Design a protein with these regions (language model features):
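Intrinsically disordered, low-complexity eukaryotic regions enriched in glycine, serine
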Residues: 3-4, 8, 34, 53-58, ...
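Terminal (often C-terminal) interaction modules
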Residues: 218-250
Length: 250
């Protein structure tokens, strides 16, 4: 973007890609590498009479009838973020499949979150290679790199995962936060409509909700190096709980 060229090189800005048949380009998402210049950019927008709104890591403003959303990302996660936000809501759809397998998939990488009830014990960063995640889910890396011409292309790509389970996408099966958010998303709702009458031939066992243990074993099967640390942390948590129970029982 020429407007930001005084602050960033082309390698530090990425205009997210949308399906090529998309007709409505009323907005533009731009991934920004690093946030060290954010205040400087916002001061420039103010002095140039471009009012902006801040929401977390996003700064939004109007430019030549476009809404521009600047998404400021950690430099270490820049490449992953570019892929995550490309192709409409694909990152969110991929995240649904990842979650049912025991992973946490976001714009900053693929993680495994060890919990004790609702308390997070540790979050393990597994990979910051988006193509590795695509491969892990049984999706075609070359197809992803080529991109998508239509919603149908995009949706069929998601359906091609052997781990695809339509139940995990239904709004009634989401928690309240995700349900409220995804109900507003055009691509997500089009996807729900698209899969209504589809039939599937997928891996046995992945057409149901996996248990915590099954998810854990799946994660370990793909990332065996974290198993020992996870087991050690679980043992320490259990030991702490036993000690607390004895103290409270006195």
């Amino acid at each position: 973007m020429s407007l930001l060229s005084q602050f960033y090189s082309n390698k530090e800005l990425h205009v997210t890609q949308a399906i090529r048949s998309k007709e409505d380009f009323g907005d533009m998402d731009v991934i920004v590498k690093g946030s060290s210049k954010r205040v400087e950019v916002e001061n420039f927008l103010t002095s140039s009479n471009y009012p902006f709104v801040k929401n977390g890591d996003v700064t939004s403003f109007l430019y030549k009838s476009f809404q521009i959303d600047l998404i400021f990302t950690n430099e270490d996660h820049y490449e992953y973020s570019c892929n995550y936000f490309d192709w409409n809501d694909l990152g969110n759809l991929v995240g649904r499949i990842s979650k049912q397998l025991g992973f946490k998939h976001g714009h900053d990488g693929l993680h495994y979150v060890l919990r004790n009830d609702d308390r997070i014990i540790k979050e393990f960063l597994l990979t910051t290679s988006y193509l590795d995640v695509i491969h892990l889910l049984g999706l075609d890396k070359l197809k992803f790199k080529k991109g998508f011409d239509s919603y149908e292309d995009l949706f069929e790509f998601v359906l091609s995962s052997p781990y695809f389970n339509p139940e995990i996408f239904k709004l009634e099966n989401l928690n309240n936060i995700n349900r409220v958010r995804d109900r507003k998303r055009k691509t997500y709702n089009l996807f729900l409509k698209y899969i209504e009458d589809k039939t599937y031939n997928k891996l046995d066992g992945f057409q149901r909700k996996l248990t915590y243990k099954e998810k854990e074993e799946f994660v370990f099967s793909k990332f065996p190096k974290i198993r020992q640390e996870v087991e050690t942390l679980k043992f320490k948590v259990e030991l702490d709980n036993q000690i607390k129970e004895r103290i409270n029982g006195r």
